[in-house]
Amino acid sequence: MWLTEAQKFGVAFTFGGFLFFLFGIFTFFDRALLALGNILFLIGVFLIIGSQKTYIFFTRPNKRRGSLFFLVGAFLILLKWTFLGFIIESLGIIGLFGDFFGVIVQFLRSMPIIGPILSHPAIAPIVDKLAGVRVLPV
């Protein structure tokens, strides 16, 4: 399945939002970088999945708390309460995208350098529990 031009821009915006958010954390919770990261991330999600699916995703009954926390955190960041806003927004991100952590862990395990580390018998159960990966007993 190939991406449309809008979806390609959406991936770029989402990645840019992630980078600005990360730079905002590295610069001791710089309000402008965190806010720009939030805006770019939301625009990217909107471009990737479309307006109707974005609305449906953020208003699902099991995602409403995460959406509320994300928006309240972003609002607090704009009101110069950056650390508290970051904490609340992080809880919202976990609430919204926590279902994808298992997929991300499985993808990272297929990578050359980090894969063996995540698959190590001492580390794998901890990572599986944190990511919510269900392992069959067989």
From Swiss-Prot:
Query: Where does the UniProt annotation locate this protein?
Result: Golgi apparatus membrane
Q: Which residues lie on this side of the membrane: Cytoplasmic?
A: 1-8, 53-67, 134-138
Effect of deleting the gene: Lack of GOT1 is lethal in a strain lacking SFT2.
What Gene Ontology terms describe where this protein resides (cellular component)?
A: COPII-coated ER to Golgi transport vesicle; cytosol; endoplasmic reticulum; Golgi apparatus; Golgi cis cisterna; Golgi membrane
Q: What residue intervals traverse the membrane?
A: 9-29, 32-52, 68-88, 113-133
Q: Which residues lie on this side of the membrane: Lumenal?
A: 30-31, 89-112
The keyword Lipid metabolism is annotated on this UniProt entry: no
| Topology with respect to the bilayer | Multi-pass membrane protein
BP GO terms, sorted: endoplasmic reticulum to Golgi vesicle-mediated transport; protein transport; retrograde transport, endosome to Golgi
Q: Which Pfam families match?
A: Got1
Per UniProt, the keywords (alphabetical) are: Golgi apparatus, Membrane, Protein transport, Transmembrane, Transmembrane helix, Transport
Provide the family line. Answer: Belongs to the GOT1 family.
Q: What is the protein's known function? A: Nonessential protein required for the fusion of ER-derived transport vesicles with the Golgi complex. Can be replaced by SFT2.
Q: What name does the UniProt record give this protein?
A: Protein transport protein GOT1
Q: Which organism is it from?
A: Saccharomyces cerevisiae (strain ATCC 204508 / S288c)
The gene it comes from is: GOT1
